[in-house]
Amino acid sequence: MGCIKVISVFLAAVAAVDARAFFHNRGGNDVIPNSYIVVMKDGVTAEDFDSHISSVAATHSLNKAKRGSETVGHKDSFNINGWRAYNGHFDEATIESILKDDKVNYVEHDRVVKLAALTTQPNAPTWGLGRVSHKAPGNKDFVYDSSAGQGITIYGVDTGIDIHHSEFAGRIRWGTNTVDNDNTDGNGHGTHTAGTFAGTTYGVAKKANIVAVKVLSAGGSGSTSGVIKGIDWCVTDARSKNTLGKAALNLSLGGSFSQASNDAVTRAQEAGIFVAVAAGNDNRDAKNSSPASAPAVCTAASSTIDDQKSSFSNWGTIVDIYAPGSNILSAAPGGGTRTLSGTSMASPHVCGVGAAMLAQGVSVAQACNRLKQIGNAVIRNPGTGTTNRLLYNGSGR
């Protein structure tokens, strides 16, 4: 993706500053006022980073006193496989100062991120598992390798997960929460996606371990910086438990284009975590959405029971694979089930099959390519420039 590094709100104020330090978020009206993500150049040391943060804190305090600003300054720092960044709440004068530091790569607005699910249809049939394990449609049986993701850890970065649901018994733990103080799934979206990627009944990788990472509220929204903080936690956790190379991460969420979001998932993938991402539900080119537009991850578009593109699904050359996403039955908080539609439902199918492949010895670096190689070329009207490959687990059926 090309970087046109400009922040429009500072055109006059920062005209004399090196243009390489600016970045413009393409499209969208979801900017969080006065909130920014600052990304450092590769090779910046921990000492240089800490020195920069201290300098920013001093500048922010000075500008706050001088102008009566109500901004809160630096909030969280991130280090994802050597990718250093931070977010904060700053006035324009402080951002102008930040952009003058030659250690800064770019700055972008923090933005609202939302889940990628649509409608609920009561009592709809469950069909996705049968479809991804057969070359032809209409089969209800799910055929899969008996390893079923055993030994793999899947991070559900979402609205949280009901860790007491019987679908996940003995295989789940709570990870972290970057959005609020409520360590439950008040929305149900995260429980549903987890049920698809690793539930005992409705899941693809039925023996995988699960970690709940909450980055979206009960209302289904969060921030780019909150998602990045969650991803940072996942990489740190996997490294501490020596599971890099044996881990997957599902992101059934998205927002408008964000280079920081794309960089974060890319570094997570490079660290050794298979990343599956929802393409989005706007029936437009997914190149305008993040983190779906990150080339390094496995981006999933949504298909229907009759092997067509779901009407809502994003499309485009950035899409790696189609997967079942319309009317998918899975787990719901409180022990029940519900049916949802969206690319949010397609992504966990991809995540689950990817995790199962990792358990069989496929590398993180090759997993998405393998999915594309064996996918069935059956999707009708996939969209301009979009693959017609449908997810297949290689069962031989």
Swiss-Prot record:
It is an enzyme of class 3 (hydrolase). PROSITE patterns: SUBTILASE, SUBTILASE_SER. Residues 20-116 form a propeptide. Its EC number is 3.4.21.-. Residues 35-116 form the Inhibitor I9 domain. This is Subtilisin-like protease 3. The keyword Hydrolase applies. Glycans are attached at N250, N393. Its main location: secreted. Residues 126-397 form the Peptidase S8 domain. GO terms for biological process: proteolysis. One of its GO terms (cellular component) is extracellular region. The active site is at D158, H189, S344. SUPFAM superfamilies: Protease propeptides/inhibitors, Subtilisin-like. Keywords: Glycoprotein, Hydrolase, Protease, Secreted, Serine protease, Signal, Virulence, Zymogen. Secreted subtilisin-like serine protease with keratinolytic activity that contributes to pathogenicity. It is found in: Secreted. Pfam families: Inhibitor_I9, Peptidase_S8. Induction: Expression is strongly increased during growth on protein-rich medium. Expressed at even higher levels when keratin is present in the protein-rich medium. The keyword Magnesium does not apply. Belongs to the peptidase S8 family. Residues 1-19 form the signal peptide. InterPro entries: PCSK9_ProteinaseK-like, Peptidase_S8/S53_dom, Peptidase_S8/S53_dom_sf, Peptidase_S8_Ser-AS, Peptidase_S8_subtilisin-like, Peptidase_S8_subtilisin-rel, S8pro/Inhibitor_I9, S8pro/Inhibitor_I9_sf. One of its GO terms (molecular function) is serine-type endopeptidase activity.
